[in-house]
Regions:
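Short catalytic-loop micro-motif centered on adjacent basic/acidic residues
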Residues: 39-46, 143-147, 246-248
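Short, electropositive alpha-helical surface patch
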Residues: 54-67, 157-169, 259-267
Length: 379
């Protein structure tokens, strides 16, 4: 199965985020389709709300409807009142220029929007969002209903239990997030499969963060496969996962399209030697962060407002070595972890808690710094 997906969130532009370079984008879309791939993923909010329109112009208006599948998402986090939900969905159909959407997702389902800060029900429940989506499916306006998810495996298990209508879940998954304490990509993936649902993988190269590694980490990978791009290791890691509809890549250049389609066309399950090399490269990557993973291990067992301190520091530290630290997927998880643990709204401030290690070292200031940064950059 050809399961590479084109993420329409980092499209080529000429000046600003909505001034698309259609000459280049059209070539990229054509090359992707020519390689045998059909899944295009957009959203109501990408590129300042213009990604769906760009998808229409570069894809829908230029290719037969049966030659591609399109996915887009309802902007849960915009807190749209229920009386505006139907209007918003119709705008998405119009933006895309289609009569139906192949894969429709409720965007960014997480603790705050699902349960609310108080645990009594977030925007998803108060606006009956799933009921609207089920109606659209019954009307034939969407073919498959799913969610994108940014929270704990525990919450995901409950959401899938409470909503059997969910057919697939989109999660951040890559070699770093797989065993991230906060992102929990591995546990979330296993929850989805245990429920018999399908998976869409986003952030396969962690927003470009795994396309270039520290020199010593790259050397480990190049020693095994000198001809593989660094990014392709992460893509291969994702492509070998089972029950996956699409592995998304937010591509910006024709070269990235060529590299990703070439990788997907030739991808085989990683060998034991390749897995060992990738694991070592990721270890070196974590060690290059401001707080090396070996140091973070010292903080296991410590908790700050119900969240493991090691998870907080790991997420903050990894964000700092991303190409765009303020837009890393890790940023979106802390507020949900705190809300899930204590039903506290981090936006109103957190009560003072002291964090002291077993040897008596006070690391409260370090933890507060990490929490403040992750809070400021949450979305």
């Amino acid at each position: 199965m050809k399961n590479l997906g084109f993420g329409m969130m980092r499209l080529p532009v000429l000046s600003g985020p909505t001034d698309f370079d259609y000459a280049q984008l059209n070539r990229m879309v054509d090359a992707f389709l020519d390689a045998g791939y059909t899944y295009f993923d957009t959203s109501f909010v990408y590129h300042n709300g213009k990604s769906e329109e760009a998808t229409r112009k570069a894809l829908v208006e230029r290719h037969p409807r049966e030659s591609f599948t399109v996915a887009t998402k309802f902007p849960t986090f915009m807190l749209i009142p229920e009386e505006k939900i139907e209007e918003t969905f119709q705008r998405q159909l119009d933006n895309l220029g289609v009569d139906y959407i192949d894969y429709y997702l409720l965007h960014n389902i997480q603790n705050v929007y699902y349960d609310g800060y108080d645990g009594k029900g977030g925007i998803v429940k108060t606006t009956h969002l799933f009921d609207h989506a089920k109606k659209w499916k019954e009307e034939g306006k969407i073919r498959h209903l799913g969610i994108s998810f940014h929270s704990s495996a525990k919450l995901l298990d409950r959401v899938l239990t409470e909503h059997p209508e969910i057919e697939f879940v989109q999660i951040a998954l890559n070699p770093i997030d797989w065993d991230s304490e906060l992102v929990q990509a591995g546990p979330c993936y296993e929850v989805i499969r245990r429920h018999g649902r399908k998976v869409v993988i986003m952030e396969a190269v962690k927003g470009g963060g795994l396309a270039k590694l520290p020199e010593n980490a790259e050397a480990v990978l190049k020693a095994v496969h000198p001809d593989w791009s660094i990014a392709s290791w992460s893509v291969r890691f994702c492509l070998e996962k089972e029950d996956v509809i699409a592995v998304l890549s937010g591509m910006s250049t024709p070269e990235q399209v060529l590299d990703n389609t070439k990788t997907a066309n030739s991808a085989e399950p990683l060998t034991d030697e390749e897995k060992k090399a990738l694991a070592e490269a990721m270890r070196l990557y974590r060690e290059s962060a401001p707080i090396p993973q070996s140091e973070i291990e010292r903080y296991k067992g410590l908790v700050y407002h119900g969240v493991p301190v090691s998870a907080i520091l790991q997420a903050w530290s990894i964000c700092q070595i991303q190409p765009d630290p303020g837009f890393s997927d890790d940023n979106n998880y802390l507020k949900n972890a705190i809300a899930e643990a204590e039903h506290v709204d981090f936006r109103k401030g957190l009560e003072k808690q002291t964090v002291v290690t077993a040897d008596g070292t006070d690391i409260t200031e370090l933890v507060e710094k990490a929490v403040a940064w992750l809070t400021a950059h949450s979305f």
